[in-house]
Amino acid sequence: MEVHEMGKITILKDKLIFERRDELTVIEAYGENCLRCRSTKNSKLLDENWTLLPPASESECFVEGDEKVATIRNGMVSATIEAGQPWYGGIISYYRKDRQILHTKFEGEYTGRNVHTEGDHYQIKVIFDANEGEHFYGLGQEQENQFDRKGSTCNLQHYNTKSAVPVVYSSFGYGFLWNNPAPGRCETTNNHTMWVADSAYQADYLIYAGETPADVLKIYCDLTGYAPKFPEWAAGFWQSKLRYESQEDLLEVAREYKKRGIPITAIVIDYFHWTEQGEWKFDPEYWPDPAAMCRELKEMKIEPVVSIWPTINPKSENYEEMNEANMLVRTENGQYGTFEFYGQQTFIDVTHPKTGSFVWDKVKENYYKYGIRTFWLDEAEPEVHPQQYSNLKFYAGNGAQSAMLYPYYYSKMFYEGLKSEGETDIILLTRAAYPGTQKFGSLVWNGDIMSTFEALRMSVKTGLSMAMSGIPWWNSDIGGFLEGDIESDYFKELVVRWAQFGVFSPVMRLHGSRLRTKNQKDRHPDVKERSGGDNEIWSFGEENYKILKGLVELRERLRPYICHYMDLASETGAPIMRPMFFDYYEDEVCYTLEDQYMFGEDILFAPISAQGQTGREVYLPEGSWIDVNTKEVYEGKKWVTCTAQLHQFIAFVREGSNVINVF
């Protein structure tokens, strides 16, 4: 039987086009050392970039070949596509320099990669062969024990404690960005690497390479944006709890910190300070004079931070107008409610162009004019129940095709509002992230996690994963969020170990919903959402207070060091909290380390994250390292055994660095 070749390759100046029945694929240069591939079953490609920025630089592109085989090279990265045989054509191989890093894998014939969902949308799969010995890092944050993503799967969807940032860094020296906001899945398993969009018009991904992890991360930031300049005050200590029920409650705590001489730079006003969900203003019964409150806080050099929720219900004075103007997330079927919390709530549609100015006008009138410049963007996923994305209707499209965009536009809305008022020091505490949110000053935390040592261990890996996902501003609730018993020995130990981790996090923030104590007084019996247990550093016993006060004071001494590296993150994309392999990428051991990390280039921190633990093994990379407790100097490229009682932590400083003087 005669076999006819299937498909045709067209070579243009800076791209390759492959066409055959039910497939159109374009591979093109995109900035420096980067290739972009788009592929669809439809007859044409869309020019939709989602959150991708235009190329930051001109491409050094070279193309060659014919209708059967062609290659495109852009600096360090190249791709070769083969027209191939019927049903198995269109094979793509990607290279970093001369090393193959990705190779298309067929699991069944090629049309099986596109399964029709609705209209011109499909469930789309992009599958590559697995590489032996490869490590993957990134994919956002999730409370689990997997830092190296090799051998695992990841659902690409947001929920409380999970931000799906669909980007990975490979130990083979390249990055991969899945440019598709549809919920889906990523499998970096031992038999294949597969990216899935549950419902999309086209596949869209970028592959980029560099000499070092820092080079690769910089290209990612060229593609999606750099964090703005980090506000100096934000490098200090943040005080928070669920929740201060009134203006006076909050001011009492702020005054006590100042009275005790404890350095504090921010205090947080949590949810239900408002009149109703979707009204974005203080309840005057409990917050009678926000202007005076803000003046007093700023005189104490404490920044007020206010929680904003994107939820709204028919009781809100803004509901009718927003609903009629389609500024709310709608449902394809059934009632409007997508979240049950003090009644059925829906969410504002932050992807709608009118929503930003409408909500910002309310925020400006009810918060900004009083002196509030920093906002806590909670519920940023958004948290819908059940998670049936195809039933959600956004301005940007059906939820099955666009739901992952929500935290991007939520952050963008407040960033642009603040910029329009001339603000430059912008930081937004946000519960979810997506590629590009970092450029809006989004400080991500890992959500409502448990108050357990297991959650602390996971949080270390979470922070490192976010660093390799291009999110340099990250933090966690010191002590965890849920079920913390401040009277228990377990929690008293936990909060100290977590605070030690907090000192060496991009932001140090004490927060949580502590269990109420037996004799806790109801200060405001009629309040809708009452406070949990106390959560100030003096709330956990006298011995803990001494330790925690010392840690907060250490954080204050570290502020110049922290600000230096946060500035570098804004300029280069390099995070202050970074995996060991980020700087020591030629040391194979460093790719296996998931419970110690570098804090900038000069501090190595090894958290203690198990109950009763007072010692652990630490790997020191090349160079000479000073133990901050004993001041003993160790030579690197070896493991050392360290001890640290509860009042101590394990950290090393690179010999020759002046930062040793703050310890």
Where are these regions (language model features)?
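Catalytic core of carbohydrate-active enzymes
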Residues: 415-426, 433-445, 466-476, 481-663
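Beta-sheet entry/capping signal
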Residues: 15, 34, 78, 166-167, ...
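Secondary-structure transition/capping motifs at alpha-helix termini
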Residues: 227-230, 258-266, 288-305, 330, ...
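Aromatic-lined carbohydrate-binding/catalytic grooves of carbohydrate-active enzymes
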Residues: 228-392, 438
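The substrate-binding groove and active-site-proximal loops of carbohydrate-active enzymes
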Residues: 204-209, 234-247, 274-288, 340-360, ...
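Acidic, His- and aromatic-enriched active-site or binding-groove loops in soluble protein domains
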Residues: 286-296, 302, 321-342, 395-411, ...
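A low-complexity, Ser/Thr/Gly/Pro-enriched, surface-exposed linker/loop concept
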Residues: 2-9, 13, 28-70, 114
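Catalytic and substrate-binding clefts that recognize carbohydrates or anionic sugar/phosphate headgroups
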Residues: 18-20, 61-231, 241-242, 247, ...
